């Protein structure tokens, strides 16, 4: 019986790749040093998996930015605006596509969106009429050669062709990206034939099969894999599915002419009993038994029992043991957590530990004595179930006391808008989403305070200095609604979680968000409760520095949930409601302190959608209720804002309207205002601010560009309900580009106001 993983974290336990990437982009190191750091990380991770008992170690899962961007480069699918001449796709062209800048060249970066329902972002492939594809990058072959030299039993991993095209987008109206399928598969054939001679298995990821696949597309899958199997020779192909059940795609997956099928038995444990009776005699079944997306220790007895059922039905030579999906979504190693509460630590497993869990399941099925390991696992499971850390009676009582009126504002939006006229905002009010650039001095002050190297007074003085400067900069720019800039916050979820019961934090629990961006998600281990006010000091201080309206900035309950590792011992909806009650208390405290515009960010509401549309209504019901529970306890004269990332709202616009925020800002510029297409068919009833420039790129957009985007927006959104703002917060940007971009944004709003006056 073989063990394998579907992928491994890329950044390194201490974010080594992040640091080298950012040094390279700044010109502080050269390409040779960046490549060397990548080789060192790959080898370290291959060895780690090998030593943990993994037989087939993935190769090709490492990336300097994103695995979908790697596939774009490998296929030569470089969009025309990047000026690629058709030669090999070099590293600078690769980063140019992702970031929109390379040396003195700038253009619009490729769009980025969430990888299924995870917190990882991928670069969206672009498809054009007349596009040609050819093998244009050799990185996979080079890394496979590296692994072979090191004696690694390597398994190349690629996004499957169906998933690659399904997750892309047409760049010309009326064009069908699937018309390129044959041409794309031709390049895949070349890739498969080249790596097949050097490995025993090739993994092609098709998580799209765990979603609602249109009928005409389903009809083409078999032919694609017939072609790939024909060029693989004796090398065996595995189709990997994950993030959910195959459901109506099960028969299709089982009929593919491949040698192995991976199924996710964490997200969809019930599908095993449907798979086993129908599995072809010659097909190996890979069991995704260890959770690749969450940090909790596995119930090993349960995993072994499930695997035993498969072995009895299939034989051990036709069963593999694996995590449910790539381990990209969890931190590298729990051994790096020295200060975490040892009780909570005993309940956790990171990537390295999950590889060890995979091996324990295999050892048990091979008849090895794993009694001691299982007893330790049993103890951890039982301790967690009974722990007083997990259960808080006061939270349970408050949950039981929630009444229907707590979900509703007192009056309609029209009435509230009249009550909010006292804010005296102009047409097309300008604002930002919340955070401003976090300069080295601010980060250093936070770190020094946390480590006890500076006093609370010194820390407070540094934060107040930043806030004063941020307010002064915004006033000088002419922004209408200000923010305090969030210098005290290392992360929009971690900052709040650190002050809430039921959350804990790691020292080195980093996971990749996109490119070099890493996040350290909180772990929600127990009942959530606010212990004290969390934002009052900084927000009220900022309001004292200006006569203009200032927004209080809070993170909403759904985003707190989606961007955390969530407890798995109760429904997610219950945990979300607990967070909503905690944030509701903060909203009411801010209002009482005189903050009359309060933003409750729900950046993650869209990404929390289940993969299957049939499950959307249930999720959206409790997600919208959680927001309303958070925001509905204020007076009509208090203006509630929310912010969301990504503009794919065509199927959920009515639910967003049900949130009943007075103002919503939505990321829109990177997708060239695709959001407006939704608003043409659905009249959003409240105020809205579609983002007019992309904050993920260092590029400064011109006034003319933003005027054009606002003009487009004004065709479907009445001017009296249109706000002007960037796509997202500005924390990761530098001050010079931030000020230049905001200056142009304010100028664009002023121009449109002038045009509107005739």
From Swiss-Prot:
GO molecular function: 5-methyltetrahydropteroyltriglutamate-homocysteine S-methyltransferase activity; zinc ion binding
Residues that, per the record, bind L-homocysteine: 433-435, 486, 601
This protein's pathway: Amino-acid biosynthesis; L-methionine biosynthesis via de novo pathway; L-methionine from L-homocysteine (MetE route): step 1/1
CDD domains: CIMS_C_terminal_like (cd03311), CIMS_N_terminal_like (cd03312)
Chain residues that bind 5-methyltetrahydropteroyltri-L-glutamate: 15-18, 114, 517-518, 563, 607
Active site feature: 696
Superkingdom to which the source organism belongs: Bacteria
SUPFAM superfamilies attached to this UniProt entry: UROD/MetE-like
The UniProt record lists the keyword Methyltransferase: yes
EC number: 2.1.1.14
Cofactor binding comment, as recorded: Binds 1 zinc ion per subunit.
Assigned keywords, A-Z: Amino-acid biosynthesis, Metal-binding, Methionine biosynthesis, Methyltransferase, Repeat, Transferase, Zinc
Residues reported to bind L-methionine: 433-435, 486, 601
Residue numbers binding Zn(2+): 643, 645, 667, 728
UniProt family annotation: Belongs to the vitamin-B12 independent methionine synthase family.
Protein name: 5-methyltetrahydropteroyltriglutamate--homocysteine methyltransferase
Species: Syntrophotalea carbinolica (strain DSM 2380 / NBRC 103641 / GraBd1)
Gene symbol of the encoding locus: metE
